[in-house]
Amino acid sequence: MKKPVLVVMAAGMGSRYGGLKQIDPVDKEGHIIMDFSIYDAVQAGFQKVVFIIKKENEADFRSAIGDRLSNQLEVSYVFQDLHNIPEGYEVPEGRVKPWGTGHAVLSCINEIDGPFVVINADDYYGSHAFKMAYDFLTSEEKDEDVYHYMMVGYRLENTLTENGHVARGVCVTDEEGHLIKINERTHIEKHDGGTAYTEDDGKTWTMLPEGSVVSMNMWGFSNSILK
């Protein structure tokens, strides 16, 4: 069975941070969040990472991030091109923001020939998440044409911050833990009575139950998703 590949969506990093060289380290040794994700992934069993980046950021990304990781695992790069879309679709005039997760994954089609896990470049997932994802995709021999997919979910209260609001995908699952749908909530905050979200700039708030499962955008797929 082919080993799972880690796919890291990093095409938006430059715009969010004002350039790759401005990414703030999170410890005294100069590590960034992605360093911890790569370490945890390697410990879980991953041996290859594919970085999805913008073509114009390639040199900076290699020197700031990619080259120093190449002694830990195989490193590949693909480019998320705004205009690389399926036939029959058009890019809206004036759009410069990269498309979402689905388009990012489509960019990897020539680099992945087996199962894979997709994460954001700038979110912290924890070592247990990578182990769960890897084990799910390697637990037994599976037909790569079968829709064998997963998402790592988190308890909402464990993903909040004391410094403002967060955006999270609130999951709806059935009794067996199967994902039915995700409701995107772009403004979630802690309140005295619990956790709530607003969709009208704070005029009204809707409480979210304690223990709600949310997505941090960590997905695992068999290769069938690319066929």
Segments (PLM) and residue ranges:
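Conserved core of the sugar-phosphate nucleotidyltransferase
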Residues: 127-219
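Aromatic-glycine-rich donor-binding/catalytic loop that engages nucleotide-sugar donors
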Residues: 224-227
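A conserved hydrophobic position in a structured secondary element of the catalytic/binding core
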Residues: 53, 220-221
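Conserved N-terminal catalytic core of the sugar/cofactor nucleotidyltransferase
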Residues: 1-14, 28-120, 125-132, 139, ...
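Generic secondary-structure boundary signal with a strong preference for alpha-helix termini
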Residues: 24-26, 30, 112, 134, ...
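A secondary-structure boundary/capping signal
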Residues: 9, 120-121, 152-155, 221-222
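Conserved catalytic-core motifs of eukaryotic protein kinase domains, centered on the activation segment
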Residues: 19-20
